Amino acid sequence: MSFLNLQNKRFLVMGVANRKSVAWAITQALEAQGAEVIHSVRSAKRLESLKKLMGERSTYCCDVEFPEQIEALAKEVGEHHGTIDGIVHSIAFANFSDGLKPFHATLRKDFLQATSISAFSLVEVANAFKKLLTNEASVVSIGISSTDVTAENYGYMAPI
């Protein structure tokens, strides 16, 4: 047994995009300690692209831009898995569909969407799952340190 005591604990990890994702590294670390990991990904398309990587792991779709999908995820996880011991929110999004622009050219709607998905969704997830969390559960968010990045590298995501 490790000092983390994660054996037989159950976690929801949100945001696996590929095998290089921080969320995937967290999955591997949790599983190595004996934890059960449930996943949520943004879309059915993403789920399909991750089929081989995810194997038999429980994986659900949830686009956190839509609160009703967060509520539906909590309901489904509760029905299939019961309580959970922690949530890892490793989700970030920025609309770069028009290409990378200078920071000062960021549109308000794009900045607010990025903030809603990348940051505020943590609040909505915690609220939706509060009845499923064990008394000693933890909810964590993974982000970048804006002291180590510049607007040139991350565009308007740097301050988020």
Task: Give the positions of each predicted feature.
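Residues at the C-terminal ends
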Residues: 28-32, 79, 134
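Conserved Rossmann-fold cofactor-binding substructure of NAD(P)-dependent oxidoreductases
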Residues: 65-80
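Conserved glycine-rich Rossmann-like NAD(P)H-binding loop of the short-chain dehydrogenase/reductase
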Residues: 33-49
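Catalytic loop of short-chain dehydrogenase/reductase
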Residues: 15-22, 92-160
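N-terminal Rossmann-fold cofactor-binding loop
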Residues: 15-16, 40-44, 64
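Conserved hydrophobic beta-strands of the Rossmann-like cofactor-binding core
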Residues: 10-12, 84-92
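Canonical Rossmann dinucleotide-binding motif of NAD(H)/NADP(H)-dependent dehydrogenases/reductases
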Residues: 3-38
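Rossmann-fold cofactor-recognition segment
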Residues: 54-68
